[in-house]
Amino acid sequence: MKASSDSKGDIVSPYSSGPIENETRGECHPISAKGGQPEKENKVSLELTEEIIQSMEVGMAVRDYSGRISSMDFHRTSTYLVTASADESIRLYDVANATCLKTINSKKYGVDLVCFTSHPTTVIYSSKNGWDESLRLLSLNDNKYLRYFKGHHDRVVSVCLCCRQECFISGSLDRTVLLWDQRADKCQGLLHVQGRPATAYDDQGLVFAVAFDGCIRMFDARSYEKGPFEIFSVGGDMSDVNVVKFSNDGRLMLLTTKDGHIYVLDSFRGTRLATFNVKPVLSDATLEASFSPEGMFVISGSGDGNVYAWSVRSGKEVRLANFVL
């Protein structure tokens, strides 16, 4: 889940100096390509219930940054977490060991959004300097840019990778959505939109969604040039869309807006199943919300600095009594 919180915790990680490559400076512990996981892993199946949600506590806190966290992403198969901060840094953490593995500074370009590729030590990130809106494919192992993706002409506000293929999608305030292949410099597709776009792939990589102006447009990834095959409305809410996401099983979608609304929809019929409300975030921040792994709960940040959770089935808030920021 990405976040817009500037709250700070109580663990400061030690660093050792690293090399300078392509303007990014790194300080790190050695990085394992396996993402900190042992070769043989014992996995436990756990049914997530309201009682378990209510009993959750903060397990790791960090304060090794000097600006608001603008974006963060968990790797799908490793124990790694990557963050982007307003202090123009990218940080890689191993959450299983509560360790910061690497800090990379991007003073020249700034950093706004960041997300993992399929590899746990490679990320794609967007700039925040106001003059270069390129996306960059960065190796965290050696702090080297592997590829630049040029095409947007204003701030990139949405980036989503396809977990099944080496492709991703980005949306910008220049009112374009671009489709990319990580192996190519030039975009593979272009869509013009009429507002601030939010983008998302489903878990199978067969469908992607583009949301703006109170509607979610559904595209077949194999024939997107034909236009959307479905358009879902969230009921007249025309405020700027912040994020759109699919649940892991693809059955549900959520959409957040600048005004603090969170909508949950059936991704097949477009039926609105629930609406949750939080205090709006700052004008330059993003209201981020996510489904729990099985899709039964929604967890979101808020402009009041708190984290909230709701049951999708009942629509009721699940109190996070032990979750104090």
Language-model region placement:
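WD40-repeat beta-propeller superdomains and closely related acidic/aromatic-rich repeat-like regions
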Residues: 2-325
